[in-house]
Amino acid sequence: MKILSVENLSRAFGGIKANNNISFEVEEGTILGVIGPNGAGKSTLFDLITGYTKANAGKVKFFDKDIFGLTPDKISNLGIGRTFQKLKPFADQTLLENVMIGSFVKEGNIKKARDKALEIIDFVDLIEKRHHFARELSTGQRKRLEMARAMAIEPKLLLMDEVTGGVDQKTIPGLVELIKKLKKSGVTIVTINIILILLWRFQIIF
């Protein structure tokens, strides 16, 4: 079953075409890799799909629902999660509080949100850091936090932007294993990440 369909998606900034008639489909339960040189519009593509930037033209469907033009919160509520290349945690809140923001939106109950957040934090192997402020975490730990925050909405589809970018070589294998575990849990993944693409050799788009 197709979980995501993108058709002729385009966005220009002035005279610069960031994305020009991009079309692709993602099957549920798979991983799709997006590759291209710096400045090719890969992150912008994620912004267009998730509503953070408005497209000039095109169609985006999540399963059979048209999500083109919807706001990020509505797209998120449908089950599309997103991580960012530039990490955006709430620096003065704890790891637990960061994840609870998303889980509370999903659960609507403080206790359930806390329990769900702790479950996710344990999943990303940060349970011992749950009471640490986000600003105290290493880059690799903040990458895991970014994934945990995206997982808090229980996404069916997760768009991952350079999840291993900016970390040292020793940290990368652990992040790769975490992504493997995430896929096994049933989440469909679209990733901008050359390391994962080389390791797994899954379907790619340019």
Language-model region placement:
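Conserved ABC ATPase signature
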Residues: F133-L137
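Conserved ABC ATPase "signature" region
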Residues: K112-K129, E177-K180
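Conserved catalytic motifs of ABC-family nucleotide-binding domains
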Residues: E154
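The feature captures the beta-strand-to-loop junction immediately N-terminal to the Walker
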Residues: I35-P37
